[in-house]
Design a protein with these regions (language model features):
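A conserved regulatory-domain signal marking ACT and ACT-like small-molecule sensing domains
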Residues: 1-148
């Protein structure tokens, strides 16, 4: 006979309220690539004209961002020659910035800190550091910056 199971009551524990940076990670040796799309009415086929050849070449992309007129992403700088070759062969107009880094700040409950990304931007822009892109999640904020 199965034992009756009691419902578990959720409760807050101390670490859920604690804040503070757990780690700061710098991933250097990256390149930021921005590929042009014909415009807001281009549709999925134009985006796939950029993404499909890269996928077929098994090139790993980070920070993929899709906008009506462009796709941008980050690749390892060592993969940039192959990315250039693939996009040139596909007839895609693009720009690439070498010497980038992805900086990630990891902290619990980061999403509940109002204005955090704005403060990070102020610090980076205040030091004349070029910022290509910023992204956040529940427990981290990452930015792609010019490192050199």
């Amino acid at each position: 006979m199965a034992e009756r199971m009691r419902p578990i009551r959720a409760r807050r524990v101390g670490f859920e309220r604690e804040r503070g940076v757990l780690s700061l990670e710098a991933d250097t040796g990256r390149s930021f690539v921005s590929a042009e799309l014909p415009g807001p009415d281009a549709g999925v086929s134009e985006a796939l004209r950029v993404l499909s050849p890269l996928a077929e070449s098994q090139l790993p992309l980070q920070f993929l961002r899709a906008c009506p007129d462009c796709l941008s992403f980050v690749v390892a700088q060592s993969d940039l020659p192959q990315v250039r070759e693939v996009l040139d062969r596909a007839g895609v107009s693009f720009e690439a910035s070498e010497g980038c880094a992805v900086i990630t700040v990891v902290a619990p409950n980061m999403r509940s800190i109002p204005g955090l990304m704005a403060r990070m931007g102020e610090v980076l822009f205040g030091r004349a550091i070029g910022v290509y892109q910023m992204a956040d999640s529940h427990s981290s904020v990452s930015c792609v910056i010019a490192a050199g």
